[in-house]
């Protein structure tokens, strides 16, 4: 069995070096690496060549900037593997990943699979805090690969794979936000098997800039409404929770201002719960302290994006703006 590792890249030379270093260190090397440079102004071709000379099977392609979905499709068209495996360029892969993946597929031959993401010990405390909030049940409901989840598992392209047979029938990714959720939905609709392999995590470097993190989760919230327009039955209660949290927080703040500070108690208890849970999970006071603002940004960004998109696309009836989505995704 040959795996084709497909990675879209945009101006991430240092991250690509770390990714290729981790792939070179794999215990099992039954894979090729297909790097697709999506119009970067700082290309990583020299890094790819360096690791190819070390013996890693790396194929490097440069194309005009059109967005990561088109870049992934470009890679799949040129890949030779039986399975396509997708990582983000800011991921680092544990040494036993492919050895474990082979075993998992032998025991449970899924058509499409995904794995969780985690924080490496070398990551900054901010990255670890964001990783915690992006994977915690308290802030996500477990929908990003947690063992306890409020909805069916949906693979994400930071750690996702599917067979060539899936690709032949379903086709490639659409150029849209949350394209991995859209892809997983189409795969499921075609009757293919989808599941979570908890044994194959990746180490995912999170954004260390709070503004960029806000923008990222804000777009996640907006894209959930786009998915609802495409798949009317896909919106679940768990997806609405950040928006409910934003509305509830604003209401409690107003009540605290005009009536009594006691209305802040529910907010305080929730943030304390996040701090305590993060402290137990990470064993670090610093990470636990940073997890509190990370959770506020995550829920606030997602919730406001969700509310904004719901109002404009559903209440005002404007629907999807495909051209805007494509333009926003270029160079991301």
Residue spans for each PLM region:
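Membrane-embedded multi-pass helical conduit in multi-pass membrane proteins
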Residues: 245-316
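A conserved acidic beta->alpha catalytic loop
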Residues: 22, 37-46, 65-66, 88-94
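Glycine-rich, basic loop-to-helix element that forms the pyrophosphate-binding segment
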Residues: 44, 63-79, 100, 150, ...
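Short, acidic, metal-binding catalytic loop of nucleotide-sugar glycosyltransferases
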Residues: 21-30
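Cell-envelope/extracellular polymer assembly enzymes that use nucleotide-activated donors
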Residues: 2-4, 32, 182
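Catalytic donor/gating beta->alpha subdomain of glycosyltransferases that bind UDP-sugars
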Residues: 174-235
């Amino acid at each position: 069995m040959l795996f084709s590792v497909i990675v879209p890249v945009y101006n991430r030379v240092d991250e690509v070096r770390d990714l290729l270093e981790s792939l070179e260190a794999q215990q099992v090397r039954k894979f090729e690496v297909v790097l697709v440079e999506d119009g970067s102004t700082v290309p990583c071709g020299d890094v790819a060549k360096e690791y190819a000379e070390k013996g890693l099977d790396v194929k490097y392609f440069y194309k005009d900037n059109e967005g990561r979905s088109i870049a992934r499709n470009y890679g799949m068209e040129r890949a030779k593997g039986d399975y396509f495996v997708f990582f983000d360029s800011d991921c680092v892969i544990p040494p036993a990943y492919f050895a474990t993946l082979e075993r998992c597929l032998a025991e449970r031959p899924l058509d499409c699979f995904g794995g969780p993401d985690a924080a490496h010990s070398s990551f900054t405390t901010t990255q670890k805090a964001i990783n915690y909030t992006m994977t915690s049940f308290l802030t996500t409901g477990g929908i990003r690969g947690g063992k306890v989840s409020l909805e069916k598992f949906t693979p994400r392209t930071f750690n996702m794979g599917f067979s060539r047979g899936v690709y032949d029938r379903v086709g490639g990714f659409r150029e849209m936000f949350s394209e991995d959720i859209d892809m997983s939905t189409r795969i499921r609709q075609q009757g293919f098997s989808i599941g979570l392999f908890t044994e194959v995590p990746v180490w995912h470097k999170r954004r260390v800039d709070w503004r960029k993190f806000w923008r990222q989760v804000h777009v996640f919230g907006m894209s959930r409404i786009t998915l609802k327009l495409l798949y009317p039955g896909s919106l679940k209660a768990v997806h609405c929770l950040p928006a409910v949290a934003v509305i509830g927080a604003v209401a409690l703040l107003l009540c605290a201002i005009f009536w009594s500070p006691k209305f802040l108690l529910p907010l305080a208890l929730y943030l304390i719960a996040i701090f305590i849970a993060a402290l137990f999970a990470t064993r670090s006071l610093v990470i636990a302290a940073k997890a509190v603002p990370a959770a506020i940004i995550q829920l606030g960004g997602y919730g406001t994006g969700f509310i904004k998109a719901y109002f404009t696309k559903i209440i005002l009836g404007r629907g999807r703006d495909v051209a805007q989505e494509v333009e926003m995704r270029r160079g991301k």
